[in-house]
Amino acid sequence: MVRRAQRSENDQLTGLKTGSSVTKGFAEGVRRGETHPEEFVIAEEVQEALRKGTPVVALESAIITHGMPYPINLELAQELEGIVRKGGAIPATTALVSGKIRVGLSKSELEMLARAKWVKKIGPRDIPVAVAMGFSGGTTVAASLHIADAAGIRVFVTGGIGGVHRGVSEVLDISQDLPVIGRARCITVCAGAKSILDLRNTLEYLETMSVLVLGYQTDTLPAFYVRDSGIPIEYRVDSASDIAAIVEARDRLNLDTGILVTNPIAETDQVDPAKHEKVLQAALKKAAEEQVEGKAMTPYILAYMQKNLPGVIEANIALIKSNVALGTQIATLLKHT
């Protein structure tokens, strides 16, 4: 059942734009087994699944390279792929490996990304540099979604998305995630925007980008580590089948509307909201003192919170597992022909 809740950078990916007829044609070519740019390497298992119409779920790799310490990051990456397989879909973790865009990683590649300290954090604007210079790195939400969309994958799962940063009136700091979510045909499943952000303005920006925000069994926007931000969202959806029906309706109508599914962390897994806000304010103050800014800000704040707020890593693991389970369920309900 679907009901209204009560409430008053860069477009290029090796020459492809998400949401465009070019990308759709590329994705169709992938499914037919035709050639694609040599820098765009789709694992054989993933390519076969796309050709046969087997559900595929895309996963990011920045959480492996920059989100958690080793070996927790590697264990989590392997477990997430296992959840996808158990749910009846094929996992496709995205990354840059030696200048190649990878859709689906081997065990050795996951190990390398989890262990290496020198790998980059790669957003959409960084992809051409990484390809040209032969870099390896973890792909952000925006870059992962670009890649998944270009490959013809219909569901992408992450922990939390980026958004509008606090103090945006002083520094115009808005994540690349938001416009990419707005353009992509591939839907994004997450636990809301990261709680370190300006969540109200993030929701407003998503509306400006014509993103349909769905609350999975919730009337309010989830806030990553915290279950309830208190900010109402317009559409509550109580089943994966309803989400799949909405996606199919959008696609039949050929609407250029991104879809963001927000899945709140379980109440038993969330961190204490009051303690969270106290530690967050301390982290923001320290970041300002050390002049941390740009794409370094989110990893800095999250690392500070992991160190100073008990239960953060456990909450992060719990929420992304829940998101992957939901995303896999949605993927298996969608048509993949």
Which residues does each predicted region cover?
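General beta-strand structural signal in soluble alpha/beta enzymes
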Residues: V57-L59, P91-L96, G137, V155-G160, ...
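A C-terminal functional module that forms or caps the active site or interfaces directly
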Residues: T257-L319
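N-terminal glycine-rich anion-binding loops that anchor highly charged ligand groups
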Residues: E48-S61, P69, G87-A95, K295-Y300
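Short Gly/Ser/Thr- and charged-rich N-terminal loops/segments
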Residues: Q6, K17, G25-V30, E60
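Anionic-ligand binding region
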Residues: R227-D251
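Solvent-exposed alpha-helices and their adjacent loops that cap or buttress functional pockets
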Residues: E48-R51, V56-V57, H146-A150, V155-V157, ...
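Active-site glycine-rich loop that binds ribose-phosphate moieties when present
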Residues: G138-V141, S169-G182, I187-E207, A240-A245
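Glycine-rich nucleotide/cofactor/substrate-binding loop typically near the N-terminus or early
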Residues: S61, H66-M68, L74-A130, R252-T268, ...
